[in-house]
Amino acid sequence: MRILITNDDGILAPGIEALYQAVGDLGQVDVVAPDDAQSAVGHAISVLKPMAVRRVHVNNVFHGWSVAGRPADCVKLAMIELLDQRPDLLLSGINAGANTGVNVLYSGTVAGAIEGAIFGVPSVAFSLQLSDELDFHKAGRIARLVLDHYIRAGLEPATCLSVNIPRLDKGWPRGVRCCPQAPLNWDEHFKKDVGEDGDAIYWLDGRLPDHVSCPDTDVEALRDGYVAVTPLRADLTDHRRLEQVTQWAWPQSFA
């Protein structure tokens, strides 16, 4: 089996090293990841400037390609230029922080996996809920258990799974829940300051509201201590609404 790994925390992040170590015995593992942190870049790609690419050896654990670009860039480069053949499986992560609810749209980790699915490759994004101490080694073991189950079930082309691992400082997960994204927005605000040149500067800050119940969703699964598995796809069409919108009295001509 050939596996491609990417992430959005950067090629030197502990999460990608833990993921590599967790799956290294499954076959040939290639790593193509951003040269620095790309959190919350979503599915952005680099079209206005070239990307520098260099080979690196990370902590005597793995060799990989370090890319001055986004996670989706890394996947495109791997699929089109860097690898001599398409991988059988793409993994993205392990991200420092959960990617649940609306975060899926912002997440570079998830975007890397969706980009893999666009290329027809079965893809999985792994994210670890934040806590005081992030145990990526344990998260890697959990990721491997989830992955082994997926492989036994049969890898489907062009599919994407988002796997969120609950905080591990309170013990091992209670199990796995397959569930949709929560329809939950962040409570957001900006911290305002003044820069050295006197211009106003703003820092975005926020958190998911703890008091809002989201039964049978990824957010609630993590709250209950379960691994949340959510199938995703690049098609954002609201098919139920599409049928309704089609019935509107649209103009038949714009001439």
Could you describe each region identified by the protein language model?
Residues 98-107:
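Glycine/threonine-rich flexible loop motifs
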Residues 9, 37, 70-71, 95-98, ...:
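Short glycine-rich anion-binding loops that position phosphate/pyrophosphate groups of nucleotides
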Residues 6, 32-34, 92-95, 126-127, ...:
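Short beta-strand segments
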Residues 78-84, 111-122:
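Alpha-helix C-terminal capping segments
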Residues 138-255:
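Electrostatically charged, flexible surface regions
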Residues 3, 14-81, 85-86:
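A cross-family phosphate/adenosyl-ligand binding-site feature
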Residues 9-17, 204, 212:
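Short acidic, Gly/Ser-rich segments with clustered Asp/Glu that frequently serve as metal-coordination loops
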Residues 117-139:
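Glycine-rich phosphate/pyrophosphate-binding loops
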